[in-house]
């Protein structure tokens, strides 16, 4: 008796779309000196979170990435995690 190779299709999960925080709040700027804001977009391992995770639009995700990299250069943010 051979097993059937037919697989059931996975149930579809509803896709939850997020709104960009910076597009909804027009007055909020992305600055490399605002480390409290930038830390929310960095993982515990020190990596910049992806756009699909944060829900930002393309332009604001680029601005966050540039600001994080600038903050790392001037030693406001660490390059990696402090624990190994």
Swiss-Prot record:
Keywords: Ribonucleoprotein, Ribosomal protein, RNA-binding, rRNA-binding. One of its GO terms (cellular component) is cytosolic small ribosomal subunit. GO terms for molecular function: small ribosomal subunit rRNA binding; structural constituent of ribosome. The keyword Ribosomal protein applies. GO terms for biological process: translation. Part of the 30S ribosomal subunit. Forms a tight heterodimer with protein bS6. Belongs to the bacterial ribosomal protein bS18 family. NCBIfam families: S18. Binds as a heterodimer with protein bS6 to the central domain of the 16S rRNA, where it helps stabilize the platform of the 30S subunit. This is Small ribosomal subunit protein bS18. The gene is rpsR.
């Amino acid at each position: 008796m051979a097993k059937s190779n037919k697989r059931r299709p996975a149930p579809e999960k509803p896709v939850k779309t997020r709104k960009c925080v910076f597009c909804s709040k027009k007055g909020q700027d992305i600055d490399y000196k605002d480390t409290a804001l930038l830390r929310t977009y960095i993982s515990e391992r020190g990596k910049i979170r992806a756009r699909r995770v944060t829900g930002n639009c393309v332009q604001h995700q680029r601005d966050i990435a540039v600001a994080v990299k600038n903050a790392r250069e001037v030693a406001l943010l660490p390059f990696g995690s402090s624990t190994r």
